[in-house]
Amino acid sequence: MKRFTLLMAGMLCASASFATDYYVSVGGAGEKDGSSVENALDFATMYANVNAYANGDVFHFAGGTYYVPANAPIVTNGYTFIGSTSGQPTVFSGDLNADGIANAGDASTLLAVQMNTVHGNTAKHFVLKNITFKNAFVNEASKAALKLDNSGWVDVENCIFEDNVSAYQTGSDYGGAACWSYRSTVNFSDCKFHGNSAAGRGGAIKLTSNAGTKGYTTLNRCQIYDNEAQVMGSAIFLHHGVKLDIINTTITGNKSGTEGEVAAVFAIGSDGTYARQITIINSTIAGNTGGAQILGRDKANVRLANSIIVGEEDNLAMRIAGTPTQLLSAGYNIIGVYKDGASAAPAWQSSDWVSSDNTLTSVFGQNGVAEGPASAPYGATAPQLTAALSEWGITSDLTADVNGTSRGEVSVPGAVVAEPMTGSFAITDAKYATYYHDFGYIMPTDVKGGVVTGANGESLNIDYKYAAGSVVPAKSALLLNGVSKTYEVALKLEEASEDAENLLKGTSEDATTTSDNANAKFYKLANDPQQGIGFYWADDNGNAFTNKAHCAYLALSGETASAKAFVLDGSATGIHGIAQVEASQSDIYNLQGMKVNASLENLSKGLYIVNGKKVIVK
């Protein structure tokens, strides 16, 4: 003990100038001075004297199970605790009675940190890496496996919180069996929370504060699953605080009771003291049972982008018990049933897919949530997401999914990169087709898409504005020109087309053609044996017809509708620029299909069909 006392005194003298790395094992080794793996500190001695080390020191814990004493010390300095990344994991366990489960007689807190710093203060920084926290049993107020108090900068990386139990349920100071963060700033990344339970107020995580300027939490690339609480958040309870950012994270399989305020993520509404803002980006909250996926009280404050939130059967996607202070969407979300007490519907973006048909089964099929959706279009591209979030102040990494897989330039919404929904169209030997889809899509290689901006006499003005690789807006009716084959296109959540000049229309299913003009004539793309590929009246009078699903049609009114056909030739502007072919004597037709009683030499300038070929007379 005398040697240890001298060692501690030496460490304190050195701490003013630099941080020191120490090595720790369950029982220690060699000289037990922490200078190397071979001379590791023993955990019991190190932990009992934890605040004697210098702020900034780093502790490397060997693999093994570290049984934390019933009265764990409160750490007041900024340290880095690093667990083993190979072989046996580093486990902080509360299982003092050694029966393998969390119950009476086990430790209630495995690590408590109280640095007494405010948000943004860099004087003390606490870091946890590669450590499992398990079998804490809480039966008193304000305790958890990881308890953070008044600490302005805590990072928790690649840690696991499992099988912790909070049985206490008196007053309001309970819940959050895995982590209770009180008036602190904590960033979780690549962490897992599972198998934790509480009577209520957060089966896994409870976030609270005593001041409106404290309480910042980020969950990035985390997995929160199979936790339980009867009420107020089977996964997370946001009680008081500034904000909670849920990014690239899955929350699934958590179980609530069936009565009261039941949901996987529960939040109190904002007020004059606490903003309580929840921001959900690139995340999946789905398949949680017993209540809504997200439940907020009156004045809940929620922002959403590029995420999937769906329930199943009676489990709503989102419910606000009153009127939200803010429900702000940056778009590209897949949302199931949403309900609130407001008189007006939320201001969803046109790139959001909000539908009662969006359920766990319809989106994920036979996949588990962790596998990613089986039926979802692409969400935001990287530039779109950056632009959409430009005013949100998000600094977290958005480039990787929950598994660390790169999202690339575009990926499906939610936490897991997966293959997108697809559509298809076929271009024949005539090199043209039309296409319409309620979703956007990415134009495939060897194809360009055009809108019809005008009709003049016998010609159409076609603007091929969508080149291969470009993103086509949702609900775009296009004329396609490309190499003959069948194409598969990746569908995408996208803002709806606002191209008011486009004279093409489309339907997502077999439906009768329509127009705002009662006197409109309707044309469909067809390949006439004599005139060639073009837009033709579907019947002799240009009346409405049944348009095929995912096809586009042309609707014209006024003088332009007197033409029965507009023949295409594959040039960028419709029929303009057709090369003159050799003249020969034969039956001659104009583009309206009428036979012309004149020789080719005596025709006026224009385009004619001779022997089934297009001929320009200049």
Tell where the protein language model's regions lie, with residue ranges.
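Right-handed parallel beta-helix/beta-solenoid
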Residues: 18-45, 65, 369-370, 376, ...
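Predominantly extracellular beta-rich ligand-binding scaffolds that present long acidic/polar faces
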Residues: 70-80, 187-189, 207-210, 216-390, ...
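Right-handed parallel beta-helix
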Residues: 122-229
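A short, polar beta-strand/turn micro-motif
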Residues: 420-443, 467-531, 539-575, 617-618
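Acidic Gly/Asp/Thr-rich repetitive segments characteristic of extracellular carbohydrate-active
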Residues: 25-62, 403, 590-600
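Right-handed parallel beta-helix/beta-spiral solenoid domain characteristic of secreted/periplasmic
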Residues: 78-141, 165, 197
